[in-house]
A protein has these predicted regions:
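N-terminal auxiliary segments of SAM/dcSAM-dependent transferases
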Residues: 1-88
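Conserved alpha-helix/loop element of class I SAM-dependent methyltransferases that forms part
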Residues: 107-125
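Conserved class I S-adenosyl-L-methionine
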Residues: 123-134
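Conserved SAM-binding loop of SAM-dependent methyltransferases across substrates and taxa
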Residues: 134-146
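S-adenosyl-L-methionine
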Residues: 152-191
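A short glycine-rich, Lys/Arg-flanked "PGG" loop and its adjoining helix->strand segment in the class I
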Residues: 211-225
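Conserved beta-strand signature within the Rossmann-like core of class I S-adenosyl-L-methionine
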Residues: 226-234
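Class I S-adenosyl-L-methionine
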Residues: 235-272
């Protein structure tokens, strides 16, 4: 993170300190990763020797970042509105056209990723992370001592969100992050070169190719025998959507060479 991140909760805390005449206060400017000391002045607040203005308008469900000249929402519009969204848990989620891409109601999106990564037992493994998103899968793979994580992310806008999110791990020797389409990128991986995989694609209506038998066959090709794959499917309503996506996913994975069992809001598949 290169500057402070401000949410409505943080901004209200700053304003309350100003009203109370408090010279200094403790708050978080990195979405709950840490706390820091801020001086609340009458016209501006000061952090690490730099003065920042109070926002004229600070909206809920919005994160503001410092551009070097002013605060702007962590959001972009390029065909769709994509934005980083604060949660009560600390680690943010993100939305595309108002649709949440990560769970937040019952559990932190970061903690949710930990549970799913545990299913593939990453320790010592080369892990394929097909749809990197904010990098929470990758973060827990690294925490779980994966030997290496190979991550793809197709959206430049998501990568931009990720660059501003203090909960997203930066690329390094253990984390390869490719800006590209994994449908094409997976073809560059040798047979049996991956020990485990995590597949968290956008919903079927947006990225049907990531649910195809052809792609699952590629996953089977790059995974070693007995390699584990967690495939997030969510729990779409078959009555309203007209299709049972989890059942379709399980059927195609079996056809591609996996043994499959339901696991929470996805399926756990083992390469035969």
């Amino acid at each position: 993170m290169t500057g402070p991140l401000v949410t409505l909760e943080v901004h209200d805390t700053l304003l309350a300190a100003r009203r109370a005449g408090e010279a200094a206060l403790e708050c978080s400017l990195d979405l709950g990763r840490s706390t820091t000391t801020v001086e609340a002045g009458e016209d501006a607040w000061t952090w690490q020797g730099q003065r920042y203005p109070y926002l004229e308008t600070c909206k809920g469900r919005t994160i503001y970042y410092w551009t070097g000249a002013q605060f702007e929402p962590v959001a972009r519009f390029s065909g769709s509105l994509i934005k980083l969204v604060p949660t009560g848990w600390g680690p943010p989620t993100f939305e595309i056209d108002g649709i949440k891409m990560l769970p937040t109601s019952q559990v932190s999106p970061y903690e949710d990723a930990r549970h799913k990564v545990a299913l593939i037992q990453p320790r010592g493994k080369v892990v394929l992370d097909t749809c990197g998103g904010l990098g929470y899968f990758a973060a827990w793979c690294l925490e779980g001592r994966a030997a290496r994580v190979l991550s793809w992310e197709k959206s430049a806008d998501v990568l931009w969100l990720r660059s501003l999110n203090p909960w997203s791990p930066p690329p390094d020797e253990a984390l390869s992050l490719v800006h590209g389409d994994v449908v094409e990128g997976i073809g560059t991986l040798p047979d049996g070169s991956v020990d485990a995989a995590l597949h968290d694609p956008p919903r079927f209506g947006i990225a049907g190719e990531l649910y195809s038998l052809t792609f699952y066959q590629e996953l089977a090709r790059v995974l070693r025998r007995k390699g584990r794959l967690f495939h997030y499917t969510g729990s779409p309503n078959a009555l309203t959507s007209g299709r049972d996506v989890p059942r379709e996913v399980a059927r195609r994975l079996r056809e591609a060479g996996f043994d499959v069992e339901p696991s929470g809001d996805g399926v756990l598949a083992i390469r035969r």
